[in-house]
Amino acid sequence: MIEASKLKAGMTFETADGKLIRVLEASHHKPGKGNTIMRMKLRDVRTGSTFDTSYRPEEKFEQAIIETVPAQYLYQMDDTAYFMNTETYDQYEIPVVNVEDELKYILENSDVKIQFYGSEVIGVTVPTTVELVVTETQPSIKGATVTGSGKPATLETGLVVNVPDFIEVGQKLIINTAEGTYVSRA
């Protein structure tokens, strides 16, 4: 059992009614009067629906045991993403709604980890950083410095990140997948 106050983004737990829930965001909130509450943005792993809720810090949940196996992202067709276990070559279908955030960071044939809850495939984990190519951005400004405010750049997966002014179309960038931010040029 794990207390609500110990839940952090990325953790998965099971509710009393059997729902498998992943924490997307968690924060402590202390109102002017009353006790501390935990505000959370959660996703039902099986349905993909997201919702906001609050818990008392002492509420307890059953932490889900999640296993991961190495895999490769194959392709997306309609509302399904296809992955292959790189050890057994088994293929898995995952609804896009369950992995839409992760798909922003991976290209076909990218290495990922498939998450299992028992024998049920519930999602994927992407590397902490990925290399992606800039497909669209404003032209560089002559004399731009690193300390500038930056500009938006669209990457090959469709992800838009804020980058320094000196970045140009065609450059390969390292992106932090936890925060969706520019790290450096590759």
From Swiss-Prot:
One of its GO terms (cellular component) is cytoplasm. It holds the Pfam family EFP. Pathway: Protein biosynthesis; polypeptide chain elongation. Its main location: cytoplasm. Keywords: Cytoplasm, Elongation factor, Protein biosynthesis. The keyword Zinc does not apply. SMART domains: EFP, Elong-fact-P_C. GO terms for biological process: peptide biosynthetic process. GO terms for molecular function: translation elongation factor activity. It is found in: Cytoplasm. InterPro entries: Elong-fact-P_C, NA-bd_OB-fold, Rib_uL2_dom2, Transl_elong_fac_P/YeiP, Transl_elong_KOW-like, Transl_elong_P/YeiP_cen, Transl_elong_P/YeiP_CS, Transl_elongation_fac_P. Involved in peptide bond synthesis. Stimulates efficient translation and peptide-bond synthesis on native or reconstituted 70S ribosomes in vitro. Probably functions indirectly by altering the affinity of the ribosome for aminoacyl-tRNA, thus increasing their reactivity as acceptors for peptidyl transferase. Belongs to the elongation factor P family. HAMAP family: EF_P. This is Elongation factor P. The gene is efp.
